[in-house]
Every structure is written in structure tokens, then in C-alpha cells.
Amino acid sequence: MDEIVKNIREGTHVLLPFYETLPELNLSLGKSPLPSLEYGANYFLQISRVNDLNRMPTDMLKLFTHDIMLPESDLDKVYEILKINSVKYYGRSTKADAVVADLSARNKLFKRERDAIKSNNHLTENNLYISDYKMLTFDVFRPLFDFVNEKYCIIKLPTLFGRGVIDTMRIYCSLFKNVRLLKCVSDSWLKDSAIMVASDVCKKNLDLFMSHVKSVTKSSSWKDVNSVQFSILNNPVDTEFINKFLEFSNRVYEALYYVHSLLYSSMTSDSKSIENKHQRRLVKLLL
């Protein structure tokens, strides 16, 4: 428990290994790989609590998270730490210290207003911006279309769950020699988003990767039609890399399970009020 609280209050990170050789690429747009236990068993424990919250009416979610949904300022904090003075979003600037893509639903918890759902059997969709592997789209590679000689490539990932995000990180670990994943204190600890910071580009591998992508998309520039789910590797990445990734993501999901459990206990407490011991513990933890 102490380790969970420490990660929430101080953040957590991991340095991923560099691979000189790209994995065999086979880009296919339109569908994500399905989840499996191999890519994170903790998710399947954590998703049970997410489903509990997903069944709650959204007006109640808003009430109980109003004071703990602080503005997500993790990207700004990363810019400050790395002394990044200018960033390039989707080609909007010709010169910058970093090229950036934010795939997260910044400062949002749910997708649409909704009443309560009777039971998990009646759940047909994930209405929360939490643990949704379908949120990872091919936009995660969009900065590479704009990358010239920037020092950093920075991605705000919408989720850490599923094969897609692990395959994506494995590719980035051949495109750049230094790749870190960070879950900052100033990110939302209600959501499984995180930041990738990549630097020291491997030009040879980047050229090979972009050649494959451009041949599949039949375009040398980014097209919005490519903003869809995708799969990119036929073969699973090596177990060593998966375990290194899970070393980081498991810390995040353990913390989220604790936070979500407190929130659910607060929302279902006998007091029928936001003034209860679970909510007080939650506020103390996150503020």
C-alpha cells in the first residue's frame, strides 16, 4: 500500500531498452488487436472496478469526482523539466524543440451523459476514458510525419492496456535510442494515460518505418482518414520487452484499482452523501 501511495504522490517512470533492429512490420488500418492476458493480467482485475464505475450515472460521477479531477498539466511539467520552449503539434510549427501528439481525453472522465446501468450484463460499451484500448489510434505515429530534427518526440498515450500500445512502444524503441514512459503526479490518477518521451533518433530505422507506412497508406503525408484503430505487428514482441513494459504499467494499474475502489466505496456508502470516510481518504490521497 505504501508503494501505491508513493507512486501516486511522486509519479512513476521506466526507461525502455533500445533495439537496433525494427520488428517485422505489417500495418493494417481499421482494427486493433484483441486484449489477452499475455499483455497485462492486472488489467482484467482492474477492469472489474472500472465496470462498476461505468454503471454509475454520469451526474453522480461528476459530483463525486468534481474536487479530485484536477487539470491535467503533466505535459506542461515535462516541457518544464526538459527545458522545452517550443512544441510542434500536427505540423503547426516549422521549428520546435519537440514534436507532440496528445491522444488522451484531456480533463475528461466519460464520453457522454448517461443514466445508471442496472448490471454488468447490461453494459454494451465503455463510457469512460479509462482502460479503453480502442482509444489508441494510428495518430500515435503521426508525429513521425512531421519529425525533422526536433530533440524530442512526445506522445500522451490514452491507455497502457492491450497489445497495441506494447507493439507501438516496441517500434518506438527502435526509432529512438532513448524512450521513457512516465505517469506524472500532475496527470489524472483516475485514468490509465501516460507520457512517452523519446529522443536521440535512429535515422536509418525511422526511414525504414516511414517507407513501410507510406507504402501502405499510399501517401507521403499524413491523412486524417488514417486516424483509426490499427495493428502493425504480426508476431508478438519478445517476453523480455513485455515484462519491462508491464513493470511500469502494473504500477499504474495497481494505483488505479486502489483509487477506483475508494471512489466506488464512496459512491455506494451508506451515508448517501459525498461526505463520507472513503471520499475523505480519496481527497487526501489525490490532492
Curated annotation (Swiss-Prot):
It is found in: Virion. GO terms for molecular function: mRNA 5'-cap (guanine-N7-)-methyltransferase activity. InterPro entries: Poxvirus_mRNA-cap_ssu (IPR005009), Poxvirus_mRNA-cap_ssu_sf (IPR043096). The keyword Methyltransferase does not apply. One of its GO terms (biological process) is DNA-templated transcription termination. One of its GO terms (cellular component) is virion component. It comes from the Viruses. Its main location: virion. Keywords: mRNA capping, mRNA processing, Transcription, Transcription regulation, Transcription termination, Virion. The keyword Transcription applies. Interacts with the catalytic subunit OPG113. Belongs to the orthopoxvirus mRNA-capping enzyme regulatory subunit family. Regulatory subunit of the mRNA cap enzyme which stabilizes the catalytic subunit and enhances its methyltransferase activity through an allosteric mechanism. Heterodimeric mRNA capping enzyme catalyzes the linkage of a N7-methyl-guanosine moiety to the first transcribed nucleotide (cap 0 structure), whereas the methyltransferase OPG102 is responsible for a second methylation at the 2'-O position of the ribose (cap 1 structure). Also involved in early viral gene transcription termination and intermediate viral gene transcription initiation. This is mRNA-capping enzyme regulatory subunit OPG124.
